């Protein structure tokens, strides 16, 4: 991977836009959850520390764009435009239609899907019924129609190139280029890549503290990556931020 990154740099390209782009490769590979059931201690898995080390190394080497700090901001969006020198993004399936396509201002067919460095997952789309609804049966019917009706799910996948929760349907889509190719991707059928990769995704151990830990460790170490604070200060900032958000946590 580093050899490829070095070759891309020689050609004037960044491998990825931001250190935040690679986080899920590491975060989805942790061996234990941030907080074990019944405990009040946050454990930072070695995979997360590997991300910190590699992110600093890659940023200093010029394999990532230093001007792009995190995700979901203007610089990150612009990194998807036709004037960008970013080679790839580590998106979920929904990132193509929801994020990449709206930010792209060039010709269709400039982007394509390929296998990631390793399997990972990044959230998804969810539907909820409100507690106390006056129409529980209707709510049930809507939820089942959106999550368990194969025809509906395949239509979502066809219209938005999104990976939906019908295993047999996604296997069919992977071999149906006529119906599931993407104009934005120059006629490529992304499901030919999505379906086999999804088979090997392993969900990381979860806890109720995941969102906060993931958010705060990226925020705290961003200044370290940018050279504004040293490692120890970034670590201390993370510990402080955790205890401020989760007063019940006794140790980090």
What do the PLM-derived regions correspond to, one by one?
Residues 1-2, 67-79:
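Short helix-initiation/N-cap motifs at beta->coil->alpha
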